[in-house]
Amino acid sequence: MAGQTIIVSGLNPAAILQSTIGGGASPTAAAAENGTRKVIPLSRDALQDFMLSIITQKLQDEKQPFYVLDLGEVVSLMDQWKSSLPNIRPFYAVKCNPEPSFLSILSAMGSNFDCASRAEIEYVLALGISPDRIVFANPCKPESDIIFAAKVGVNLTTYDSEDEVYKIRKHHPKSELLPRIKPMFDGNARCPMGPKYGALPEEVEPLLRAAQAARLTVSGVSFHIGSGDADSNAYLGAIAAAKEVFETAAKLGMSKMTVLDVGGGFTSGHQFTTAAVAVKSALKQHFDDEPELTIIAEPGRFFAETAFTLATTVIGKRVRGELREYWINDGLYGSMNCVLYDHATVNATPLAVLSNRTNVTCGGSKTFPTTVFGPTCDALDTVLRDYQLPELQVNDWLVFPNMGAYTKAAGSNFNGFNTSTIVTHLAYTYPS
């Protein structure tokens, strides 16, 4: 995995900041030459100035795109999680964004990790994180990955087919299984999971019997309502269905189950507030008689989406009457793949560092209907259409906020534009 890793420790934001910049260094000093990276402390409204400073640095002579990771935003989101869902342990979904610095600060604040492959497990273990803080949350795993999980001690895993039981029995009999059930209502999820994963109600008992016959431990139940779910009511039905699985296991004489994995689907902001209320209500209704129950979740975009900002350079321009067309050096085959695969909507803010240095944000300037293309030769590589932007020139910049979820992680190297080489800079914002 490309990129450097910072070392962070402690739950206190000040302590995290201090450890990321190196012990004893002043907040604006570069980290010691030990592989850690410089972290800049900023007020919340100074992030744009920080990005401008990066753009003007000699390191940006080639004007390559870059990310800024706001560690302060991550701390704030973790505070929200612990305040709203204090009894649910987050297992961050590594697939959403595996940036090492991001994983490090999440780990320091107590997050565990949801991994879906051997490579993701290796990312997490490389940061010194214990294997018992990982759930291997992929219901269908290659046998080689199961063998690796057994070797390194990652035991908690999901399944939703009898064939998976046979693979696990053969290669990792010490596994602790979580049958994954299919929610009957996906609640308008941006990316539904039900068509691919999850046992139907009539399949649950055979799956439990298969694990029982294989003498494997079934520790609990998991589900996932879908990524970016907009309807929190989906959790209500899923938690009720999970309770039925607990009851079925008890009727089969299986050992008492102790884990409930409520999956992902959480998005920061109002959706999270309503989701937290729905989850707590359903848990009280269906699992209030399970005081020893360990409840976990697999949030991805909740922590990642708003913590990252992407800066891109305008590399080309064409004028057709009132229409302005710009090419930038990242696009749908790179970070903006989220537009296609994650059904995301992106927004751009201009930084006219070349054409309007006295008003780089172009406040009050006339705007034009604009199309923004990515850099590849494919016409599909269109980031924005009918979008209002001011007049820009080649070597001006466009900045995209909320670009942390399923962006760089899913990018490609098509046409030789290598998404994996995009650098991430670190900042730590405080409320103004």
UniProtKB/Swiss-Prot annotation:
Pathway(s) this gene product operates in, as recorded in its UniProt entry: Alkaloid biosynthesis; nicotine biosynthesis; Amine and polyamine biosynthesis; putrescine biosynthesis via L-ornithine pathway; putrescine from L-ornithine: step 1/1
Binding site for pyridoxal 5'-phosphate: 227, 265, 298-301, 406
Known outcome of mutating residue 96 to A: Almost unchanged activity
Class in the EC hierarchy, top level: lyase
Keyword Lyase: yes
Regulation: Repressed by alpha-difluoromethylornithine (DFMO), 5,5'-dithiobis-(2-nitrobenzoic acid) (DTNB) and salicylaldehyde.
Name of the protein described by the UniProt record: Ornithine decarboxylase, chloroplastic
Source organism per UniProt: Nicotiana glutinosa
Lineage: Eukaryota, Viridiplantae, Streptophyta, Embryophyta, Tracheophyta
Chain's gene name: ODC
